[in-house]
């Protein structure tokens, strides 16, 4: 990050006017007094220096701030200010996405929204302390939503507000609990979620057990297949009555099926577990559950939509490799939130700044008109 004053003015122009930042910071409780830090823009600048700025400690940030006449305060004072500013940084990041959504809103047809989450661990490794849940638009190649929770908060398809013009796409982590899928089955948005052959309570329309392996074995070799199933509540009556869904089995090509089965055997061998023969057999297929009607979306179209899911995985990798989101420096909860939100704000700003250059193809040397 370039720390020059000219560069900061350009960055600030993408976030908001100084007086607007002052108001939002006061409303969020981030700027209760102006001693040492004169305004909200300065507080934000210090937060970005500590987060995506790459500075290794609060002491380094305060030394840089004094050297460049940004602010004069101790590392302890900065710690208190950044802890109080955590929620405000999150609000600024959310506002950046809200402006983006207003500009790039869907104009026709269904909008695809990929959803996934990633774990963030505190310094020293060990178990993850935070989980970052995010939505991603594969059309604009930009994030659309985010929510930060502790690591105990499970994945949910309904975490973000639903709209009738969207299709949510998620991996098997979202397809292991019927209540997770039910929220969209009776909601506004459609869904495509990958499932495990034993991950849900599969029922027939009559309420009898659905023979998943019989269904897979009945498919023509190398051909896709589909049927309508009922999703049971896994014995939890409070979860509601069974609901219908469209089950699609996508047959993998022989070489990819072999890779899938080899990976499955390797992972279970490493964990000291024995793979069931049925599980190994099912690994030759990708099982998708969807609410999309058959007369509007063929099985192949549903599979094509799901194949776009790699984009959000790649986006998470960019956050971790370029902004080092997985290198959390803070252990104290509020300071950790401030660090994560500052990094997200920087990532969203970078996307917005470079997006105009991606909207038009570069002009080739031979495209100039000759006079």
Curated annotation (Swiss-Prot):
Pfam families according to UniProt: DDE_Tnp_1
Keywords, comma-separated and alphabetical: DNA recombination, DNA-binding, Transposable element, Transposition
GO biological process terms on file: DNA transposition
Domain of life the protein comes from: Bacteria
UniProt GO molecular function: DNA binding; transposase activity
The protein's role, per its UniProt record: Involved in the transposition of the insertion sequence IS421.
Family that this chain belongs to: Belongs to the transposase 11 family.
Protein's name in the database: Transposase for insertion sequence element IS421
């Amino acid at each position: 990050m370039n720390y020059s004053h000219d560069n900061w003015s350009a960055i600030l122009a993408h976030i908001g006017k100084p007086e607007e930042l002052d108001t939002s910071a006061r409303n969020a409780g981030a700027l209760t007094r102006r001693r040492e830090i004169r305004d909200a823009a300065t507080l934000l600048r210090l937060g970005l220096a500590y987060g995506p700025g790459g500075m290794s400690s609060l002491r380094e940030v305060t030394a840089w701030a004094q050297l460049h006449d940004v602010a004069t305060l101790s590392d302890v004072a900065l710690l208190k200010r950044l802890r109080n500013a955590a929620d405000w940084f999150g609000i600024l990041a959310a506002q950046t996405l809200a402006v983006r959504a207003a500009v790039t809103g869907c104009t026709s047809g269904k909008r695809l929204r990929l959803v996934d989450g990633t774990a963030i661990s505190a310094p020293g490794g060990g178990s993850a302390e935070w989980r970052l849940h995010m939505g991603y638009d594969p059309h604009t190649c930009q994030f659309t939503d985010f929510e930060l929770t502790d690591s105990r908060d499970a994945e949910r398809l309904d975490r973000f507000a639903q709209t009738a013009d969207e299709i949510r796409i998620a991996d098997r982590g979202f397809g292991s609990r019927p209540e997770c899928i039910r929220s969209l089955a009776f909601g506004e948005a459609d869904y495509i979620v990958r499932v495990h052959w034993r991950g849900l309570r599969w029922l027939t329309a009559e309420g009898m057990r659905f023979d998943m392996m019989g269904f897979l074995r009945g498919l023509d070799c190398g051909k896709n297949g589909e049927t309508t199933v009922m999703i049971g509540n896994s014995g939890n009556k409070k979860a509601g009555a069974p609901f219908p869904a469209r089950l699609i089995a996508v047959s993998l090509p022989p070489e990819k099926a072999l890779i899938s089965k080899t990976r499955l055997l390797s992972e279970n061998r490493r964990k000291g577990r024995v793979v069931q023969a049925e599980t190994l057999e099912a690994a030759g297929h990708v099982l998708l559950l969807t609410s999309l009607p058959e007369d509007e979306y063929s099985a192949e179209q549903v599979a094509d939509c799901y194949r776009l899911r790699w984009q959000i995985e790649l986006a998470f990798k960019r956050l971790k490799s370029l902004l080092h989101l997985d290198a959390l420096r803070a252990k104290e909860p509020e300071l950790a939130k401030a660090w994560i939100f500052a990094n997200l704000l920087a990532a969203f700003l970078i996307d917005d700044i470079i997006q105009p250059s991606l909207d038009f193809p570069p002009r080739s040397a031979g495209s100039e008109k000759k006079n």
